[in-house]
Amino acid sequence: MTINSSFLASKLTKKPIIWSISGADCSGGAGIAADIKTGHSLKVEVCHLITANTVQNSKRVSSINPIEVKILAEQAQALRIDKPPAVIKIGLIVNGEQINWLVALLLSLKAQLPDLLVVYDPVGQASVGDCLTTLSTIELISLLPLVDVITPNVFEAKQLNALHEKRSNNDTLNMAENILLLGCNAVII
């Protein structure tokens, strides 16, 4: 049997694929745009599933326009066909319907791709302070056991910490330990 050298070369030089599941920030400073910039600087291919179109700039958020789950499912199906992920990076999830869809997607992908790594940056508010999601912290419970690494800032860690009966208000180590007990494999605050 002969192996085509160009086929072999393409397999050996194939870039890892990251799926970014997040919002689109029209100012380019956050969300999908930031993930694409970061991914390209790391020499990986970035595919994106857009959860919301936000209208914002460096001063304020004017509107958040959630994408229907039906469209998210179509985006995921299109990518599953020829661009399966090595990593999924989750950012803005706008509502409970999106969480339910995401949990089902991750369960399916992890069954198909056992080495899949899931990173969650729990975006709840914009850098200008406006709330970006109607999602309650309690709705995240079903997602957290599917997350390999969660990267909350201190404010987000305090919100997640409120889900645990042994709350710790300011100690980042205790907050991280409590978040781990919610099902994540690793926490970076």
Model-based region annotation:
Residues 47-51, 117-121, 143-155:
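Non-cysteine beta-strand/loop elements that form the S-adenosyl-L-methionine
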Residues 87-89, 119-120, 151, 188:
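Generic enzyme active-site microenvironment
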Residues 1-87, 163, 167-189:
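Small-residue (G/A/S/T)-rich helix-start motifs and N-terminal tracts that mark the onset
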Residues 130-189:
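Conserved phosphate/ATP/ADP-binding segment of small-molecule kinases
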Residues 89-99:
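N-terminal glycine-rich "phosphate-gripper" loop used for MgATP/nucleotide binding
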Residues 117, 121-132:
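Rossmann-like NAD(P)(H) cofactor-binding subdomain of soluble oxidoreductases
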Residues 109-118, 182-185:
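A short helix->loop->beta-strand "cap" motif at the edges of active sites that frequently abuts
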Residues 93, 123-125, 155:
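Active-site beta-loop-alpha junctions enriched in small/polar residues
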